[in-house]
Regions:
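Structural recognition of alpha-solenoid helical scaffolds
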Residues: 1-4, 22, 35-40, 60, ...
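N-terminal "cap/leader" segments of large eukaryotic alpha-helical scaffolds
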Residues: 1-51
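Hydrophobic residues within the alpha-helices of tandem HEAT/HEAT-like
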Residues: 12, 27-31, 60-68, 112-118, ...
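Extended alpha-solenoid scaffolds built from HEAT/ARM-like alpha-helical repeats
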Residues: 17, 21, 37-38, 122-126, ...
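Eukaryotic helix-linker segments that join adjacent hydrophobic helices
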Residues: 49-113
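HEAT/armadillo-like alpha-solenoid scaffolds in large eukaryotic assembly and transport factors
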Residues: 26, 70-87, 158-171, 181-185, ...
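Helix-loop junctions that connect tandem helical modules in alpha-solenoid scaffolds
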Residues: 8-15, 40-49, 93-102, 132-141, ...
Length: 256
């Protein structure tokens, strides 16, 4: 199965339109095999497959999750849904890619994991949140960036006032990354502020039903953040390529 998927992925990358079209149709057929997801996850992990094929594999896996991971998906298509044993294998492989030294693979894996989280957390993948927080806390700057990419999609779309325990755990890590300019990239720090803004929006949306809770907890959180945010505004603007801090300043404005 894995060899078949590999060859079809190569065809999907062909510059020849007819070859590419045939390969894309063949890939759709292979998705009907319950072993497809672990096979394509293995290819994404295989360094010998080459960067282009590995990138294609993890992108295709994300699409597969939308179509075949859960009958509750808005994009669900008829076909076998992997059992929990297969899903567990695929989750582990995708999570491993968050520690890849290839930035594109890490980012694509983060998007894939965020898609899985929509259906699997907390019931089927209860440890995911703590695993991601651990990457933020103990991982290197690239791993922290990958974990932040997951939170960037996940918090905004799938967390709510029912997840205050998780938000309370996440907020200190977001602030630590935001203020650690020497340890993390501008991009990662910008995402930390963006996710902080998403968390604050979730808390604010609770005011209609838990006004006392919001009134008690929101001010101390904002007080902790306001000083470093104002300090960011006081720094000279940098506009040099990826080191530009303009996106960071924009997110700070949105957050307050």
């Amino acid at each position: 199965m894995e060899h078949q998927v590999f060859e079809v992925l190569q065809g999907c990358l062909s510059e020849e339109p007819n070859t590419r079209m045939r390969a894309e149709l063949a890939l759709k057929q292979l998705e009907q095999n319950v072993e497809f997801s672990p096979a394509i996850a293995n290819i994404a992990l295989a360094s010998e497959a080459g960067p282009a094929v590995r990138q294609a594999a993890i992108v295709q896996l994300r699409g597969y999750i939308g179509r075949h991971w859960s009958i509750g998906s808005a994009k669900y298509e008829q076909g076998p849904i992997p059992d929990q044993q297969l899903k567990c294998q695929v989750r582990e492989k995708a999570f491993t890619l968050l520690t890849s030294d290839n930035r594109k693979l890490r980012t694509a894996a983060a998007a894939t994991i965020a898609s899985m989280a929509r259906y699997d957390w907390p019931d089927e993948w209860p440890q995911l949140f703590s695993q991601l927080v651990e990457l933020l806390h103990s991982g290197d700057r690239d791993q922290a960036h990958a974990a932040m990419c997951v939170f960037g999609e996940w918090v905004n779309s799938d967390l709510s006032g029912q997840h205050m325990e998780q938000i309370g755990t996440l907020l200190p890590q977001l602030k630590r990354i935001f203020v650690s300019s020497g340890d993390y990239s501008i991009e990662t720090r910008t995402m930390a502020v963006r996710v902080f803004g998403d968390c604050i929006e979730i808390i604010a949306n609770m005011s209609s039903v838990q006004n006392d809770f919001v009134a008690t907890h929101a001010p101390p959180i904002l007080e902790e953040w306001i000083s470093p945010i104002l300090a960011t505004f006081g720094q000279p603007v940098s506009t040099e390529g990826s080191a530009s801090d303009i996106p960071l300043k924009i997110e700070c404005i949105k957050a307050i």
